[in-house]
Amino acid sequence: MAIATRTLKDTKIATGSGAAGGKVTVLVNMNDNTTADSLVVDASGLAGHANGAKLDITRIWWALVQGTADDNTGWVSLYFEGDTDVTAINLVGTGHYDGTAGKITNSVTNTGATSGDIKLSAFGTSGYVLIELRKDSAFTA
């Protein structure tokens, strides 16, 4: 019934002409988590964040097991937060997404400020999710 998130890496492109973007790596650990809408990446807290900046998912590793409940459990959903949230990917079991099929693009729209945040909903799940993200050009050096 707990979730813990840790930012392992938050880089930005070196200062200079046209310098923008960067990479972020986040580790999410869960113990029999049933929490909906857990904030796992607060984009405004990342280096170089500006209004309208978005994060795209480039790679993911995960190892998830079912918690104590027995129905429809043992999986998580990652989604991009917006006026209407957009599901990025659903994860179950153990695996990885290596990005060879391309990044998972943050396609949310907002009528107001764009947060760029990523949330996770867990369904009776224990384990971890390691997420590698790419900052778009709205992140400044």
Briefly describe each language-model feature range:
Residues 104-128, 136:
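Noncatalytic modules at the cell exterior or secretory-pathway interfaces
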Residues 67-91:
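Short, surface-exposed beta-strand/strand-loop-strand elements in extracellular ectodomains
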Residues 17-19, 32-52, 70, 76:
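Surface-exposed ligand/attachment interfaces on beta-rich extracellular proteins
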Residues 60, 126-141:
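Exposed low-complexity, polar/acidic, P/S/T/G-rich flexible segments that act as propeptides
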Residues 54-66:
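A short beta-strand element within beta-rich, extracytoplasmic domains
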Residues 1-29, 141:
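Short, intrinsically disordered N-terminal pre-domain segments
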Residues 57, 73-75, 128:
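Exposed beta-strand and adjacent loop surfaces of beta-rich binding modules
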Residues 85-107:
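An anionic, turn-rich surface loop/hairpin at beta-sheet edges
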